Amino acid sequence: MLDLGLSKMALIGVVALVVLGPERLPRVARTAGALFGRAQRYINDVKAEVSREIELDALRTMKTDFEQAARNVENTIHDNLREHERDLNAAWNSAVSPGGSAAADAPDGPSAASGEPSWRTIAAAPAKRRNWRVKKAVTPVWYKRATMRRTQVQSGAARVARHRPASLRRPARFL
């Protein structure tokens, strides 16, 4: 930056001593030192912020590259799945139709109108709605015994009281 040697610094100090005088020189030197320190801290903060921004920019570019690679992988997988689905639909249509390719060229029924493959509509029969509140069957007692399922549940306090030895029990008081 500035080429200040020892001789130039001594010259500046002598001029400041003559101009300011011995009484005000220490106060001015303290003020100048404080201002110089503030300037250095400000410059260091700016440098740190610039380096942080550069790192963030690098991270952003890495993130976009990673997202692009993930999108490419996803698109490749979807393309492969669509291709296999097309092959399966063609095989299904040729196997299901009695005429072979004639039925595949002119599909009829609900799958042709909705645009869905025929194997989806045939396999996916409308499911009955069940009422989850109504219990349809009871688990047999023999099954509960065989699988050692608890049929009568006790609280922890009742279980402790049941297995406590008689010597440790409190005497029962009746009026």
Swiss-Prot record:
<dbReference type="InterPro" id="IPR003369">
    <property type="entry name" value="TatA/B/E"/>
</dbReference>
<keyword id="KW-0813">Transport</keyword>
<keyword id="KW-1133">Transmembrane helix</keyword>
<keyword id="KW-1003">Cell membrane</keyword>
<protein>
    <recommendedName>
        <fullName>Sec-independent protein translocase protein TatB</fullName>
    </recommendedName>
</protein>
<dbReference type="GO" id="GO:0033281">
    <property type="term" value="C:TAT protein transport complex"/>
</dbReference>
<comment type="function">
    <text>Part of the twin-arginine translocation (Tat) system that transports large folded proteins containing a characteristic twin-arginine motif in their signal peptide across membranes. Together with TatC, TatB is part of a receptor directly interacting with Tat signal peptides. TatB may form an oligomeric binding site that transiently accommodates folded Tat precursor proteins before their translocation.</text>
</comment>
<feature type="region of interest" description="Disordered">
    <location>
        <begin position="153"/>
        <end position="175"/>
    </location>
</feature>
<comment type="similarity">
    <text>Belongs to the TatB family.</text>
</comment>
<dbReference type="GO" id="GO:0043953">
    <property type="term" value="P:protein transport by the Tat complex"/>
</dbReference>
<comment type="subunit">
    <text>The Tat system comprises two distinct complexes: a TatABC complex, containing multiple copies of TatA, TatB and TatC subunits, and a separate TatA complex, containing only TatA subunits. Substrates initially bind to the TatABC complex, which probably triggers association of the separate TatA complex to form the active translocon.</text>
</comment>
<feature type="compositionally biased region" description="Low complexity">
    <location>
        <begin position="94"/>
        <end position="115"/>
    </location>
</feature>
<feature type="region of interest" description="Disordered">
    <location>
        <begin position="94"/>
        <end position="118"/>
    </location>
</feature>
<feature type="transmembrane region" description="Helical">
    <location>
        <begin position="1"/>
        <end position="21"/>
    </location>
</feature>
<dbReference type="GO" id="GO:0008320">
    <property type="term" value="F:protein transmembrane transporter activity"/>
</dbReference>
<dbReference type="Pfam" id="PF02416">
    <property type="entry name" value="TatA_B_E"/>
</dbReference>
<keyword id="KW-0811">Translocation</keyword>
<keyword id="KW-0653">Protein transport</keyword>
<dbReference type="InterPro" id="IPR018448">
    <property type="entry name" value="TatB"/>
</dbReference>
<keyword id="KW-0812">Transmembrane</keyword>
<feature type="compositionally biased region" description="Basic residues">
    <location>
        <begin position="160"/>
        <end position="175"/>
    </location>
</feature>
<keyword id="KW-0472">Membrane</keyword>
<keyword id="KW-0997">Cell inner membrane</keyword>
